[in-house]
């Protein structure tokens, strides 16, 4: 049995296109980076290739949509030097630690350091906003009602209820969280 470094899953039309023409960056208009916490480390090498080489000569818009870790990855890719930004993110993310009994203020303070590493200055933020080819969109979950409580016990109770509601049906999560989309406005090439 042969082993392959990359497994391609595609529908019949896409698979025929890939077999006939190979992978061509111009064939892709949208890329989605899902959440997944530290699992994104498995994609780090592929990310370096995709945004350091494969998409580097792109002259048309590539819409990238990320949530959680995917949002951080893609915030790196919309910068002028995506490889360097991705390395900064990887370094910061892999070295973050929290004290055992950290409160939310300390967790927020420590987590903010990742933002400082991904965006060391306002220049990198502006690069994301002004990038003519890489158009960033982010999906976040906004806590609603009791889920947005600042008190630890209320929040823990709400998350427990949300988990239970999710077991019944994902539709019930709308009572606890709202999906919010952020995107970079403006014209695409």
Where are the predicted features?
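Patatin-like phospholipase
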Residues: 1-63, 76-189
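Gly/Ala-rich beta-loop-alpha elbow adjacent to hydrolase catalytic centers
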Residues: 66, 70
